[in-house]
Amino acid sequence: MDFLLNIIPAAITIATVFLLGSTGETLMEKTGHLNLGIPGIMCFGTVGGCLGVRLVLVMYGTNPENANYFLLVLFALIGCSLLSALAGLIYSFLTVSLKCNQNVTGLALTTFGGGFADYFMSLINKDGFADASNIINTPLPFASSLGIFGKLVLNYNIFVYLAIAIAITVSFVLKRTRVGLSFRAIGENPQTADAVGINISKLKYISILIGSMIAGLAGVFYVMCFVGGSYENSSTIQSFGWLSLALVIFTVWKPDLAILGSFLFGFLFILPNTIEVSFVVMKVLDLLPYLVTIIVLIITSISGKKSVQPPSALGLAYFREDR
């Protein structure tokens, strides 16, 4: 029981990074854009969120431990959203307006995002970030009074519940709303969508910008909520970005399934650090998220069911004259 009480909260916390990244990517892929720039966008989100936190800490001078919880969360969200949207705007301009190759553009954005984060995070004064992290990580006020249930389900910061709410909302929008139907139509057959009057470029821009803002939250969450406000380099954040891309495939492009899938990825990520195993076994366990993703990809490809396949126009630029 003690083992579960320790590993489940840690798995849920790191699962939030995967969930935010995969939800943002799924929204983009539903409109036909395979954005391999997700790791870079998460780096942009990290810088923006940390700048927001820094602005709040400046207000409190030498007493960062007294910083206001609401302001820290709000400024982190605003800063993260702005820079993540900027990264998404760069990607969408290149791939939607200029019709650049999506894979090349995404990889370039990931490389640029890593360098961008490493440079600007080295300039940001991180004094007080540990205090800000402690404040942001404040769990729900009544969690401690509900025993095991409170510790396993309610003992998390607001970002965890925000990530779940975002995933559920995106799933609902894609399945149950007119704009979601338009998104899916663009991803499956943009020629037909264009023929019935759907504004392809406009909706692609919207999905990419919103998806980027969601994915960017994963970066600032990792720094401020998982590693206590510290930052060494962008490589770890980018590794979570690649795992988020794998999670999209693992959960067959369904944000609601990503809630459970992200917990599994989080559990597999935490497991090697909580049990005593050899170095070789630890590395094998690190590979498991990728291995299970490959297995799922093989199974879905063999099954041939449309409901578990990627959007038909995924990764393809749309040229109206080809209609």
Name each model-derived stretch.
Residues 1-22, 30, 34, 48, ...:
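Membrane-interfacial amphipathic/re-entrant helices at transmembrane-helix boundaries
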Residues 21, 46-50, 114-118, 160-172, ...:
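Hydrophobic core segments of alpha-helical transmembrane domains in multi-pass membrane transport
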Residues 113-175, 280-285, 311-323:
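Transmembrane helix-bundle core of multi-pass membrane transporters
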Residues 170, 188-196, 200-202, 275-323:
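Cytosolic-side transmembrane-helix boundaries in multi-pass membrane proteins
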Residues 215, 225, 229-290:
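Transmembrane alpha-helical segments in multi-pass inner-membrane proteins
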